[in-house]
Amino acid sequence: MTENIHKHRILILDFGSQYTQLVARRVRELGVYCELWAWDVTEAQIRDFNPSGIILSGGPESTTEENSPRAPQYVFEAGVPIFGVCYGMQTMAMQLGGHVEASNEREFGYAQVEVVNDSALVRGIEDALTADGKPLLDVWMSHGDKVTAIPSDFVTVASTESCPFAIMANEEKRFYGVQFHPEVTHTRQGMRMLERFVRDICQCEALWTPAKIIDDAVARIREQVGDDKVILGLSGGVDSSVTAMLLHRAIGKNLTCVFVDNGLLRLNEAEQVLDMFGDHFGLNIVHVPAEDRFLSALAGENDPEAKRKIIGRVFVEVFDEEALKLEDVKWLAQGTIYPDVIESAASATGKAHVIKSHHNVGGLPKEMKMGLVEPLKELFKDEVREIGLELGLPYDMLYRHPFPGPGLGVRVLGEVKKEYCDLLRRADAIFIEELRKADLYDKVSQAFTVFLPVRSVGVMGDGRKYDWVVSLRAVETIDFMTAHWAHLPYDFLGRVSNRIINEVNGISRVVYDISGKPPATIEWE
């Protein structure tokens, strides 16, 4: 019998902050399971979840507005510790008898708070000391409203000149509120505060570790599918690869992976996937060469959204045909991860249980009555990668830059042709190879090459020629919501350009994209 790794759990109520998923990831990093629910949960749902503690997230609303979100009153009656972050502190203060006002001074960015009273939350935690020996904490503020009076049974723990109640606490009830964001790295001791709350105040054990997550997933897969057969669409991406490895460990040859080679993959990618999963790890793989079918369907199409839909539709058709050839398959496995679940949850349901169709499978034929197996649906992307390493997948594969679902279909601008894909594959491979050689690959968040459907004049030997243009793209980003173009060294860019033009016959010009996001997107289509 495997250990119950969900025994100690934290509930995070989401009030809409851009950092809320980061709070959940930080709690997981502390080795404790947590779930992220919309703020409007019911008492019954909270009772059923039985949390060891509750975190109230930040949010963009103003608690001074009449219809702004409120924590369910039961939260404060559940008898468990509560940690309010920014908006979460404000709604806690207001709901428990304090007062919140819109502030004339919006506090955004770095601040230093002075600890004025002892509290279990920050005891022994400091970045510096005042002249008279009081602890100082470097924190990241982001708020317009501020608490102007705390509930009568709370004490002020820390303050700034413009924020008199930067931390408040009721030690007896184990209720804490902070007017800053402990989950971001700019709050230097933020992780220690979260650890203090989760591990010490809530008394949660560190049960959520890669090895234990794998044991738990394997046990749950075996319990769910028994001796039945399972089918999985294997793309070679992180999510489907880790799903394949977990299922293989759990059910062995009862798993069949269908690898659809659509002709839109990176250089030698199909061979690498088949070698690694088939030959090295011994998975049962059905290889479907379908390049001609995809390219025929894409012929003449220039619109990016239409191309995406065509690629998705043809994938589903090919996958369905292969699935129907297999006998007695009862289950479809998908690489759904926790952010997919969160994104798809309707806030009215409170709990994130509505799961969207994963981009790489789609609808199955009506005659195929199959159950769904989603072994990664509780995991964030960084956790999936850690699980992959534990299962023996190579680091370079797990930490590769993101690759779009439609593949080169959206990196060849306009109509997609085999000639264009072949040129792009080779140019992109040179760019990535040089990034790795220069130790720059892991210093940028994403790098790739784009094929431009324009011919440009070039000089080769004594003659002129008109050949194609490619653009190099490299960005630096934390969350992929905004991004800066990467300032790669000129000599490096020159080396890449020379290699592509000399080694890839058919390309005469290389340009570098220096657009940020916004206004541009990271991908060109």
UniProtKB/Swiss-Prot annotation:
Question: What GO annotations for molecular function exist for this entry?
Answer: ATP binding; GMP synthase activity
On subunit structure and binding partners, the annotation says: Homodimer.
Q: Name one Pfam family in it.
A: GMP_synt_C
Which Enzyme Commission number(s) are listed? 6.3.5.2
Q: Which Gene3D superfamilies match?
A: 3.30.300.10, 3.40.50.880, HUPs
Q: Name one GO cellular component term.
A: cytosol
Claim: Ligase is one of the keywords in the record: yes
> What's this protein's function?
Catalyzes the synthesis of GMP from XMP.
- Which PROSITE patterns does its entry note? GATASE_TYPE_1, GMPS_ATP_PPASE
Where would I find the Glutamine amidotransferase type-1 domain in this sequence? Answer: 9-207
Pathway-wise, it operates in:
Purine metabolism; GMP biosynthesis; GMP from XMP (L-Gln route): step 1/1
Q: Which domain of life is it from?
A: Bacteria
Domain GMPS ATP-PPase, which positions? 208-400
Keywords (alphabetical) are:
ATP-binding, Glutamine amidotransferase, GMP biosynthesis, Ligase, Nucleotide-binding, Purine biosynthesis
Residues in the active site?
A: C86 (nucleophile), H181, E183
Its name, as the record gives it, is GMP synthase [glutamine-hydrolyzing]
Catalytic activity annotation:
XMP + L-glutamine + ATP + H2O = GMP + L-glutamate + AMP + diphosphate + 2 H(+)
User: Which residues of the sequence carry a binding annotation for ATP?
Assistant: S235, G236, G237, V238, D239, S240, S241
